[in-house]
Amino acid sequence: MKQPILLAIIGRAKDTVNYETAFRQLEVNCFTTLNMQDASAATHLLLPGGGDITPALFGQTNHGSYHIDTELDLLQFQALETFIASGKPVLGICKGLQLINVHFGGTITQHIDTADQHRWVGKDQLHYVYHSSLSRLDFFYQLYGNSTLVNSAHHQAIEHPGDHLIPVCRAGDNVIEGLMHDSLPILAVQWHPERILKSGGDILLQYFLSLTAL
């Protein structure tokens, strides 16, 4: 018998309402927590969007980062490490993509030159992202083909991808918008699928929920 899905969202409750609402619309049991024992009981992990990652965690001084929450960063890294060790599925959204990248040794550009095309302007901005992997077996191509329209609310981006992470899609300015691990059930996107469920976001979230532990 297949184990029921239980999704742990690692964040502060005041910041995760959109995520819980989206997954409950997909009839998924989910909860927000900062307790690692509670999180480890879940079948799936979500690392949500939020402020910027503490630059020291990827070997830089602060030159453009803000809304930093180092305590939360460290708890999210701890949860990620726990799920990696158990081979359970992980999804990173926005900041979550950047956390996953940093965990695997990647770096972040703290303020991209094209930030005005990506950042929050009182609402999400919309732009296309394009398949960029050499393979057609990655999740992005399987779900969306060569391109899809996404929402955007960020001013930072991946500089160098971490070890074993494959960029699967990019924006028109070459910003990496999606990653997957080459052997673990880990994927991440720079956009916010939870806010565009009826415009293709549900496809990605359902795919993530279909993944199982190794």
Model-derived regions, located:
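Short, surface-exposed charged micro-motifs
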Residues: 157, 168, 178
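N-terminal beta1-alpha1 cap of cysteine-dependent amidohydrolase-like domains
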Residues: 1-93, 101-109, 113-144, 159-165, ...
